[in-house]
Every structure is written in C-alpha cells, then in structure tokens.
Amino acid sequence: MIYFFLKKIKMKLVSWNLNGIRAVEKKGLSEILEYINADIIGFQETKAQDDQVKEALKNVAGYHIYSSSAVKKGYSGTAILSKKEPIKVTYGLGIEEHDQEGRLICAEYEHFFYITTYVPNSGSGLHRLEYRSKWDSDLLNFIKNKEKEKPVFLCGDLNVAHKPIDLKNPKSNFNKTPGYTQTEID
C-alpha cells in the first residue's frame, strides 16, 4: 500500500544512518545526495550539533534542512532534508526524558508525516533495556496519535535485528549483541 501511495504522489524517500555526518561529508556527501536526488532524506546518528550539521551540508543545494542534536556533543542526532518545505516540523516525542538525545524529527506534509528516528540501543548487558522499552512504548503512542490525522512513514535506525537476515553472523551474535537478544526481539 505504501508503495502505491508513493507512486501516486511521486516522491522518493530515503533513510540513512550516517554514523557521523562530518566524516561522511569528507567522503563526498553532497555528490552522493545529488546522485540520489531524493525528495526527503532522513539521517540518523549525525553525531554533531545543529550548526555542525548545517556546516556539513553547506554544499547541498535544494533542500530545507532540519536538525536535532543531543545535549551530549558528538552523540546520536537526527536530521531531515526536504525539497519541499513541510507544513510543520517537531523535534522529539515531547517527553523531556527522551528529547535530550536528538533522536527524532517529525515533518508534516499535506498527505503524510515523515519521521526519522535513531532509537536508543539497549546497550551491552542490556543496561538500557528498561529505558529502551519506555522509549518504544512512547514512540508507538506518538505514531498512533499521528496516524489519527494521516499516514506515517517511520524511517530510521530502530536498533533491533528482528530476523537472522538482519545481522551479519546471526548465530554467533544471538543473545550477545545489543538489538539481537531474545528479550528485545520478543
């Protein structure tokens, strides 16, 4: 259904975990984005403050840029690049506990919402599992509220490998790698 919806409105949506926007910028980010030529691009793990994101994207033409950075410098962060200016852009889930890490941006368009998110990792030994579970529940509520208005495209790094195909070396990583434990999969 989503595919047909996108074909009808003729848009190309992209999601990309950068693992550091400044490093990718040095490797030709603007040329890559020009080649991709997407209407909306969601970045995760920018690992930069908002001004650094804008600086890294200074050679990228034709996009409105929205960035959300973590209070902790060099950590997490998300961004949206959009050829068309959204009706409205919101940052975070509206819950202070979650909104310190720059993990979500929601752009509202005429016919849909586009959300880019970098979901918290449960951490080694699952030390952040309780926080992660709360985040997941709050994110689901956020999405359900948006869906009451119009369709939602959730894009990003969800930090979970639900099936063995989602991870390199699934047998040796099962129950050892954050995001690929039975507790998280359930």
Question: Residue spans of the language-model regions?
Answer:
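Short catalytic/ligand-binding loop motif for oxyanion handling, primarily in non-cytosolic enzymes
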Residues: R22, D50-Q52, G74-Y75, G123-L126, ...
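Soluble or luminal CAZymes and related metallo-dependent hydrolases
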Residues: I21-E25, D99, Y131-L139, Y180-T183
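Active-site-proximal beta-strand elements of phosphoester/diester hydrolases
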Residues: M11-N19, H111-G123, C155
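N-terminal, active-site-proximal structural segment of metallo-dependent hydrolase catalytic domains
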Residues: I2-N59, H64, A70, Y75-S76, ...
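Short amphipathic alpha-helices and their capping/turn segments at secondary-structure boundaries
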Residues: S30-E34, R103-E110, D138-K150
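Surface-exposed cleft-lining segments at the edges of enzyme active sites
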Residues: G94-I95, V119-D136, K171-K176
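Structured beta-strand-rich core segments of catalytic domains in phosphoester-bond hydrolases
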Residues: T46-K47, Q52-S122
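Metal-dependent phosphoesterases centered on the DNase I-like endonuclease/exonuclease/phosphatase
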Residues: I40, A61-H64, W135-D186
